[in-house]
UniProtKB/Swiss-Prot annotation:
Domain spans labelled VWFA: 64-206
UniProt-recorded name of the protein: General transcription factor IIH subunit 2
CDD domains listed in its UniProt record: vWA_transcription_factor_IIH_type
Any one Gene Ontology molecular-function term assigned to this protein's record: zinc ion binding
GO CC aspect terms: transcription factor TFIIH core complex; transcription factor TFIIH holo complex
Function text: Component of the general transcription and DNA repair factor IIH (TFIIH) core complex, which is involved in general and transcription-coupled nucleotide excision repair (NER) of damaged DNA and, when complexed to CAK, in RNA transcription by RNA polymerase II. In NER, TFIIH acts by opening DNA around the lesion to allow the excision of the damaged oligonucleotide and its replacement by a new DNA fragment. In transcription, TFIIH has an essential role in transcription initiation.
An annotated GO BP: regulation of transcription by RNA polymerase II
Organism, scientific name: Caenorhabditis elegans
């Protein structure tokens, strides 16, 4: 009888094998799985760094991303101390820094969902300061009610449908609820997102939801459930790299303007804040129609010209020729080529120049610099 109780039911084995629970989450002597989660996160980071990124593919580097934040009553849960809301806000702040470092010509908009309704918190912008200030206005007391996936997707679709065909349109949902209360058929909304080539991804904070899994599968997005705050940061980091562009997307030449950041002395209003005064005395003047903008990259609403800075385009170019993954090798003696630290145990060798680097330098080169000092 004791052996049967330990084995459990037959149908449980299928789920355990599919999720590799027995291999990933192993309890320690005290019955905790924190060490197993930390090891899983570290192994995932190592695997991502050692995986060679595909080359010679079309990438959607002009990204327009709507981030949907679940602000239902489930966000106040203490499952991730101090609360899921605090953990998500901190992770989003870090994600914004990394996102715009990797995607300098991208834009992000914010949507909150509570009381079965979705509201736009921030319109599409490339100004990270505006996005962070908007996040700081949210408090845990703001959370309440239930989550509605359909209303969130419909509002995101309304904000993305007017974007030009050559941009990558994406939705990233952060969901804490275990259910969604929708006014209609959610699968018809998912079909609409698929038809409009809007890539929908989700990060769960509770357990896996079948409808989110089907949404990600239909729209070629990603869906994962966070195990702890560190794992949540890892899941967010997966969305910093630009996705591959669909074959059906437009690939025409784009007319681009390069305005200068200058002090504006004449009295004027900006097209991004038509109802209020400009947020700064400095701004960007559209090179085609002369409209004032507070920040770039942006698409001028007057003449539809794409406005960017030359350094932003240069930084976006690195995704077209990414730094190849280094080969992990066993090292008994020698020094790291970059920081000259003595190597012992493992090293990472560049496939082009055959020079060996330590773990810290390998991480720095692939996540920040994107160039090999030995090859250059």
């Amino acid at each position: 009888m004791d052996d049967d109780e330990q084995k459990g039911y037959t149908w449980e084995a299928g789920y355990a094998e599919g999720l590799n629970i027995n291999d990933v989450l192993v309890e320690d002597e005290g019955g905790s799985i924190e060490k197993s989660i930390a090891k899983y996160v570290a192994d995932s980071k190592r695997k991502a760094r050692l995986t060679k990124r595909p080359e010679r593919i079309r990438l959607g580097i002009m990204r327009h991303v709507m981030i949907v934040i679940d602000c239902s009553r489930f966000m106040t849960s203490k499952a991730m101390p101090p609360s899921r809301f605090v953990v998500v806000m901190k992770a989003l702040q870090t994600f914004l820094d990394r996102f715009f470092e990797q995607n300098p010509i991208a834009q992000i908009g914010l949507i909150t969902c509570k009381d079965r309704k979705a509201d736009r918190l921030t319109m599409m912008t490339g100004n990270i300061r505006v996005l962070k200030e908007s996040l700081n206005t949210l408090t845990e007391a703001f959370c309440g009610g239930d989550f509605s996936l359909q209303n969130a997707l419909q509002l995101a679709c309304a904000n993305l449908k007017g974007m030009p065909g050559h941009v990558s349109r994406e939705v990233v949902l952060v969901i804490s609820a275990l259910s969604t209360i929708d006014p209609g058929n959610i699968y018809s909304t998912i079909e609409t997102m698929k038809r409009m080539n809007i890539r929908c991804s989700a990060i769960g904070l509770s357990a896996e939801m079948f409808v989110c899994k089907e949404m990600a599968k239909a729209t070629k997005g990603e869906y994962s459930v966070a195990l702890d705050p560190d794992h949540l940061q890892l899941l967010f980091s997966k969305h910093t790299l630009p996705p591959s562009s669909a074959k059906s997307s437009e690939c025409n030449a784009i007319h681009v303007g390069f305005p200068h950041h200058e002090l504006i002395t004449t009295r004027s209003f900006c097209v991004c804040h038509p109802d209020t005064k400009p947020i700064s005395s400095r701004g960007f003047i559209c090179t085609q129609c002369g409209a004032r903008h507070c920040s770039i990259p942006a698409e001028c609403p007057v003449c539809k010209l794409t406005l960017v800075a030359a350094p932003q385009l240069a930084r976006a170019f690195r995704h077209l020729q990414p730094l190849s993954a280094f080969e992990q090798i066993e090292v008994t003696r020698g020094f790291c080529y970059a920081c000259e630290t003595r190597l012992s145990g493992e090293g990472f060798r560049c496939g082009s120049c055959q020079l060996v680097f330590c773990l810290d330098c390998d991480t720095l080169l692939h996540e920040s610099l994107h160039v090999c000092p030995g090859c250059n």
